[in-house]
Regions:
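Catalytic pocket-lining loop regions of alpha/beta-barrel enzymes
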Residues: 11-107
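Short acidic/histidine-rich active-site segments
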Residues: 104-126
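Mid-to-C-terminal alpha-helical segments outside catalytic/metal-binding sites
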Residues: 25, 127-164
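Non-membrane alpha-helical structural segments and their capping/turn regions in soluble enzymes
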Residues: 9-20, 38, 124-131, 146, ...
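Metal-dependent polysaccharide deacetylase catalytic core of the NodB/CE4 family, i.e.
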Residues: 2, 6-8
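Short, glycine/acidic-enriched loop or turn micro-motifs at the edges of active sites
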Residues: 3, 39, 64, 112-114
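Residue-level recognition of specific faces of alpha-helices
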Residues: 59-62, 97, 114, 129, ...
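Metal-coordinating catalytic core of metallo-dependent amide/deamination hydrolases
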Residues: 1-2, 81
Length: 164
């Protein structure tokens, strides 16, 4: 659920209306939310604040905003989804976010078939390519790749309430 202002259709007002309604449904059912927010940082945050969307947690899918915006979501207890974009040469902002954020609030994503990590960029994305994302995160955070795999797996289990 969320807002995507990259394209003009559907219009922003309609997107905001249905995003708000979907947040209400998530609150009523006490489910975490998976938020898609593209070129819509302010409106996404405003609507989430307006609808108290923080209580059941969730993830900001394919996080692509600044470290300052990341801090807002992290302070609210949300996870940030990190995928192939972190391997791109021009993803300076996202690399800064990964460096500053705790592993305890990170989940790994593919966004398949899109956003394929380097060195496979331009091909159809596949979950098998997550190893490149893990390697990049390990380099940015100066930690062991096995630790990243273990912690992000635990995070996904918590987020999706697997085994609870």
């Amino acid at each position: 659920i969320g807002l995507d202002y990259y394209y003009d259709e559907p219009g922003r007002d309609l997107q905001k209306k249905w995003f708000a309604r979907q947040l209400q449904v998530a609150a009523e059912t006490q489910m975490p939310v998976i938020i898609h927010s593209r070129d819509a940082a302010k409106d996404t945050l405003d609507i989430m604040n307006e609808h108290c969307a923080w209580q059941n947690g969730g993830v900001i899918h394919c996080f692509s905003y600044s470290p300052e915006i990341a801090k807002i979501y992290l302070d609210k207890g949300f996870y940030l989804g990190i995928g192939g974009v972190v391997t791109f040469k021009n993803s300076k902002k996202l690399k800064e976010v990964v460096e500053m954020m705790p592993l305890s609030q990170m989940v790994l994503e593919t966004d398949s078939p899109y956003l394929t990590p380097v060195p496979h960029r331009g091909k159809r994305n596949d979950s098998g390519y997550l190893t490149h994302v893990v390697d990049e995160i390990a380099a940015l955070k100066s930690c062991d790749r096995e630790e990243i795999i273990r912690i992000t797996r635990e995070n996904a289990h918590k987020l999706y309430r697997i085994g609870q």
